[in-house]
Amino acid sequence: MNSERSERITIPVLPLRDVVIYPHMVIPLFVGRQKSIKCIETSMSNDKKIMLIAQKEASKDEPTPKDLFDIGTISAILQMLKLPDGTVKVLIEGLQRAHIKNLTNNGEHFIAEVELISSSNLLDKNQEVLIRTTMNQFESYIKLNKKIPLEILNVLNNIKNSEKLADTIAAHMPLKLNDKQSVLEIRNINDRLEFLMAIMESEIDLLQVEKRIRHRVKKQMEKSQREYYLNEQIKAIQKELGDMDEIPDENKILKRKIKSSKMPKEAREKTELELQKLKMMSPMSAEATVVRSYIDWMIQVPWYLKTKIKKDLQQAKKILDIDHFGLETVKDRILEYLAVQSRKNKIKGPILCLIGPPGVGKTSLGKSIARSTGRKYVRIALGGIRDEAEIRGHRRTYIGSMPGKLIQKMAKAKVKNPLFLLDEIDKMSRDIRVDPASALLEVLDSEQNMNFNDHYLEVDYDLSDVMFVATSNSMNIPAPLLDRMEIIRLSGYTEDEKLNIAKRYLYPKQIERNGLEENEIKITDSAIISIIHYYTREAGVRSLEREISKICRKAVKNLILDKSLKHIEINSKNLKKFLGIKRFDYGKIHGTNQIGQVIGLAWTEVGGELLTIETTCVSGKGKLTYTGSLGEVMQESIQAALTVVRSQADRLGIKKDFHEKHDIHVHVPEGATPKDGPSAGAAMCTAIVSSLTNNPVKSNVAMTGEITLHGKILPIGGLKEKLLAAHRGGIKTVLIPYENKRNLEEIPKNIIEGLNIHPIKKIEEVLKLSLEKIPYV
């Protein structure tokens, strides 16, 4: 080392990787690079002084001057040892900081002209406080950082030089390379100590968080280990007492159940994998409960077990006839399915959809189909379901997740070929966010449901053996879903059917439910018919059953209060005592023929209804008014009917300018009830003609049919329901579109025989049959 000026020297430079040497440090170094070895040899041949400086990037084997920091440490080589592998081990002691002013490469190693750095002293008033604070903080730090021995505190307490104290603290802290270099480069001791305190404060915060985490983990592990230890102790005690012989191993039980369930390969492999996970878990852990629940569901779901389908058509027909009166179309369809089943063992289960008004027996019919086919009966109420997960199940990532209702019900049935009743399929909630009906598309597609995937099970499940029967009050079902089902319509019951149903099913059921004996009460046929006429007006029989139940309750009360009373007979004469005043007028719609008042026939979701249409013509300026919560289609029917009347005004004896001098008001009573549909066109036209010509409409005539501008009557839907409504209402004559004549074959004979039905083609026929006087001149 040659002295150039008092504060500058020339010295060999040794680059270091990931190491920063501070003054007063004694540290061994292993040197392997040839240039570094040459540098050490040069130093040893002179005064054993060397400049140690850190590389900015440790990955570079051949660093350039740009790859080295500017400030390093002048050090002395205390010992050098050449190792057999060619590397060199040296013991170094740091002496003083130095700043490189000029760095060159002489071909063998780096040589630098450096300027020695003298540290600035602390002010006396700050020295003691700063050192004490630094020491306290470092003590807190090493108590949290278990890697630094506590003995270092004794060493630090004996250091009186603040510069040496700062460098010693930095040397014992696991700092990043840039932070180590920053400590080396800070010349002011005050700043250097404050920098170290800032780093220690940050590290203490992190170490405290780590300590809390370690404490929680340790506590949890101790709890799990304690539970495991106690469980093992219990097992050992039970074994000593001989109780373990009676308690078989749970894992063996589950493995045996998995094998006996005869799952498909995919499901079995999935379940066995979960069982392996369960073996490695603590029995008391939350995750073990989740896995155990999954395995239980996989075992409970029926994978192969089936009930034997009955193939005796005569017995099946007998069961259907016993359980339900009428409904021949549905019964025929079930018998057709059983007939094919008797010829071919494997056929896809039919997917039927029973559509009809409330109370006609759709749900109870599902039970009868199950009985007649020998299947187990399973029912899901779909009304109000708004989440797809109710059908497909929840994924196991969610807390409290379960399979969907389909899989739950299949597990409850314990066979894979039950009859599945999807009740009220039209009542599922739908909006822009959720559509549970879409989840049923796969279920109700016989080509796809053999691979139904429940989100909880995560494996395919075969639903192709299930017989699905859906029920609905209307056709308000998504088109893709409707397309997958075979639609069977159930119309309302006739009076004779209601009488038979009441006598065969409703009356005996209510006697039993209310604790009556058959010899204590008798409800005559005349009483039942009076209930049908005057106390109910419905397509089904629910209200009829409620009225019979009401009679039975009052009969029980009378028998208990009057001990002398042994038998009660209810007939049409004393019915009022049990049910009160009549609620409806049967066969008395208007009583007398009236001008501008026509009886139309309407279809609703609960069956057919009689629809009164009123029209009044007054002097005015040609204003047309319609009231009664009428929909757009019905409003258009009124306008079409008015145009027909204007086009035939001459023939009807009406002045041509009537529409300019008269205001016409069309009203449909029960204004709070919305009404719509095209089938009231003929009735609207008849009411307008009656009002304009002062020609009364016959009160015993009802009509239905859409009208065109040329007076043609177009066909309508729901004819059976409308004719049943006319029959219930005591109507004698019904006018229907001519093209609906073919639908009369579906109407019960007693209804057709009780009505005078006229198929009509033109409005002229309607007016001639419905008005008192022949309107045409």
UniProtKB/Swiss-Prot annotation:
Transmembrane segments: none
GO BP terms: cellular response to heat; protein quality control for misfolded or incompletely synthesized proteins
UniProt entry keywords in alphabetical sequence: ATP-binding, Cytoplasm, Hydrolase, Nucleotide-binding, Protease, Serine protease, Stress response
Principal EC category: hydrolase
EC annotation from Swiss-Prot or TrEMBL: 3.4.21.53
Localization per Swiss-Prot or TrEMBL: Cytoplasm
Reactions catalysed, as given in the entry: Hydrolysis of proteins in presence of ATP
A Gene Ontology molecular function term of the record: sequence-specific DNA binding
Function (record text): ATP-dependent serine protease that mediates the selective degradation of mutant and abnormal proteins as well as certain short-lived regulatory proteins. Required for cellular homeostasis and for survival from DNA damage and developmental changes induced by stress. Degrades polypeptides processively to yield small peptide fragments that are 5 to 10 amino acids long. Binds to DNA in a double-stranded, site-specific manner.
Protein name: Lon protease
Organism of this sequence: Buchnera aphidicola subsp. Acyrthosiphon pisum (strain APS)
Organism lineage: Bacteria, Pseudomonadati, Pseudomonadota, Gammaproteobacteria, Enterobacterales
